[in-house]
Amino acid sequence: MFSASHFCSGSLMMSHPLSSLRDLEYHGAFVERHIGPNDVEIAQMLRVVGYDSLESLTDAIVPEKIRSTVALDLPKGITEEEALAKIRVIANKNRVFRSFIGQGYYGTHTPKVILRNILENPAWYTAYTPYQAEISQGRMEALINFQTMCADLTGMEIANASLLDEATAAAEAMSLAKRSAKSRSDLFFVHDAVHPQTLELLRTRAEPLGIVLRVGTPEEALQVDVFGILLQYPDTFGRIGDHRVLADAVHARGGLVAVASDLLALTLITPPGEWGADIVVGNSQRFGVPFGFGGPHAGFMACRDIYKRSIPGRLIGVSVDAAGHPAYRLALQTREQHIRREKATSNICTAQVLLAVMASMYAVYHGPQGLLRIAWRTHRMAAILAAALRGAGLTVGEYFFDTLHIVGIDALAIHCAAAAAGMNLRMIDNAQIGISLDETVTRSDVVALGQVFGVQVDVEALDAITADALPAGLLRSSAFLTHPVFNTHHSEHELLRYLRMLADKDLAMDRTMIPLGSCTMKLNATAEMIPVTWQEFACIHPLAPVVQWSGYRQLIDELEAMLVECTGYDAISLQPNSGAQGEYAGLLAIRAYHRSRGEERRNVCLIPESAHGTNPASAQLCGMQVVIIKCDRSGNVDVDDLRMKAEKYSDTLAALMVTYPSTHGVFEEAITEICEIVHAHGGQVYTDGANMNALVGVAKPGRWGSDVSHLNLHKTFCIPHGGGGPGVGPCAVKAHLAPFLPKTLPLPGDAAGLPVQGTQEAKVGMVSAANFGSASILPVSWMYITMMGAAGLRKATQVALLNANYIAKRLAPHYKTLYTGRHGLVAHECILDVRSLEKVSGVSAEDIAKRLIDFGFHAPTLSFPVAGTLMVEPTESESQQELDRFVDAMIQIRGEIAAIEKGHLDPEDNPLKQAPHTAVQVMASQWGHAYSRELAAFPLGVLHHAKYWPPVARVDNVYGDKHVMCACIPVEAYKEKGDSEIQDLIEEDASRC
């Protein structure tokens, strides 16, 4: 028989058993899994910082005026197994029907090799946005595959690396058209057959920007002067229209043509780029990404090359590295909010990278022939069903790809019959039904759908006699996806190895700490991720009847209550599917609140100069005038400047946007006074929730005077960053702003599952395509809060504060921390000021960031919020060992800088200026540097045991923006420049033998 001694040895052996079963039933185990340092390490770190407990450290950092005096009103934490069992009960309340609703969402098969090796793989889902090119080559290659896929299928010249959803992409297309069109009109024409959710978002976006929408038929568009038009192709009812004449007419008047389309349909029908479209948007969801009750899915935008400097969102481009080899990087970043602020093309920050990677690999796996087979099979199923229904005397649309539009029927009776058979159809009105088929449809599904209409379908017989239903004049003739990457990896082994090769090129949290300030790269626990792929969450259509998603309703209600308790607000919307959209929703709420009080004049938004770029970009989208507030020498909001400008704009003040703790990494003592000043002049206070990881369980913004915040569930509440998305940015408000949260689409669903009319009278439109945004990843945050419990959440915040101060303290002899609060402490992040070092040594913050790659680290945030600095946020999930590894690397780098200062290393030919160093460089036959290979690649002995090799040397940013290329690299570009020389040496060696 085994005893405890079989599992314990030496100092770890327990001298006596625990006293009771209650002690052994340790329900708080997950807290210790999530928080990196154990209690012994916490005590050691506290001694370094100079405090004897987490409580005393918290009291020293967090101002007393805002500090919570009572614990969060949340249950105690539970184990992973208990939480999974609890959420399984919730999931089982959802009813998974076969959904043929369509409206932009379609059934799909996620290839299992993609499910396991991307969606369930932390090498992909724990990565950050690829700002640091050298350690992001793998996911950027996947994203350039996505861009190539979208550009090829739409017939356009360039595409971005994903947007939040199709409706948001359409709104962005409208803004792009407004910026770029020659026409000075304020009118944007919208096809009356776009998806309803798209029209809702267009209405939300247009009004604050002074854009006038007109909805009508394509024929009516010929009669008006517009700066742009949006067409749906195929349209929401499945019809495939010929819009060539209309496109020519719009162009003749100086307008642009935007098209919302379907990537799978475009394998068969003429792509919009070939008949006059300037911009094409859509959703890549049906390329292997489940419904997810609305998301997350990767929207996309493709456009003509002349608009590349105005296209919103991330854009992956091709440059060269220091050795002249091809390398990927984020291209044309000066378009983006983190640089251009209120002048940016968009407020988009987080996009949908993980889902874009999945969609791109779906195309890689199937290739052009596989996609054609899927598209033709889907179309044949639809054509056979249409033939059967017509044969029974029903009226069905003539031309379509996958969606049948059936008119002149008792739609309610059909809808109910389908529901009784476990199927969802789209009830357009009392006399119209829509049926959208997809790659998951089988012959038995077609038979069952026919039976709903009382029609017997002989699939085999109808297949033999039924013609296709695509218009002959709009059949695609052009090739697509011709690059070798889409024609190589079609066996599972090949794709598996390709995915592994790409993942190995990158640094994600499965390999190292990612100490990015303002990004909160914390543990995304496996238990939190598991429910995401359950079919009860993944396979619910976002427009399914209410009675089918009571499990989701419970989960959403419970999560909203949890977040309200954590923040001190009164109401919350989970609809925003990014932090930027949460900001947008919050500012729209403020705007609508003022207008409801007859104060339309209030349009000034005060923003500190240290704010994240999304703040002014979001304010601009809401039609607000941005006025900048100075910061004082300590990095805090200059209260005198705030007071002066609040008085100056008292009659027009709408809001103050403030981040707390500040983007400078400190708890500002004057935050309550700041709120009082703004309120005294009629404004509302918007607190950016980006730094909520320093507040949960410690302070509540809704209690110190803030009126509204967005949260980042992909930061504070553990949804993974996915390499640049997905994210969820809930908007939380005080009670007086609750009526102005985003509206939702009416859904079918009374007690019997019959359609009922929505009754919500919202004053603010939708900000995302789906009512609950990226609903399928909400279980991640629910699991995190449930397992941590009230005490665990508070401890997580306290350890986040400790870890940041531990790093600042240990590095104090070597690097100056730019800003501190009282007692010389920082919040959950610290800014390391290296500007004085650069003046003496020539070594910049960027050089340090690149050198950290040689140590196996992702760099801290570079030059934000202060140019020439590094902002470090370690999060509570990092152990003391990992923190010390980072500190040791930074100390070694400081030693190298000192060697440059003393003349021991060359000012240019040194390991910092030449970093990072690739394996190819280090192992080359010639080493032309004045420092050793050992110093280049193994500056610390620990690296001999675990070494990350960057796949490329330092990437040339200037070259990349001068030579913009945003599609797959031609294979010949990879040919090594030195191949012939190496071959000559090999032949010379052979001749000697």
Curated annotation (Swiss-Prot):
Protein name stated in the entry: Glycine dehydrogenase (decarboxylating)
Query: What domain of life is recorded for the organism?
Result: Bacteria
Q: Which family does this protein fall into?
A: Belongs to the GcvP family.
> Which UniProt key words apply to this protein?
Oxidoreductase, Pyridoxal phosphate
Which residues does this entry mark as bearing N6-(pyridoxal phosphate)lysine? K715
Record GO biological process: glycine decarboxylation via glycine cleavage system
Q: Which organism is it from?
A: Xylella fastidiosa (strain Temecula1 / ATCC 700964)
SUPFAM superfamilies, per the entry: PLP-dependent transferases
The reply on keyword Oxidoreductase is yes
Q: Which reaction does it catalyse?
A: N(6)-[(R)-lipoyl]-L-lysyl-[glycine-cleavage complex H protein] + glycine + H(+) = N(6)-[(R)-S(8)-aminomethyldihydrolipoyl]-L-lysyl-[glycine-cleavage complex H protein] + CO2
UniProt key word Oxidoreductase: yes
Gene Ontology terms: cellular component = cytosol; glycine cleavage complex
GO molecular function terms attached to this record: glycine binding; glycine dehydrogenase (decarboxylating) activity; pyridoxal phosphate binding
Described purpose of this protein according to its UniProt entry: The glycine cleavage system catalyzes the degradation of glycine. The P protein binds the alpha-amino group of glycine through its pyridoxal phosphate cofactor; CO(2) is released and the remaining methylamine moiety is then transferred to the lipoamide cofactor of the H protein.
This protein's cofactor list reads:
pyridoxal 5'-phosphate
Q: How does it assemble?
A: The glycine cleavage system is composed of four proteins: P, T, L and H.
Q: What is its EC number?
A: 1.4.4.2
The UniProt gene name for this protein comes to gcvP
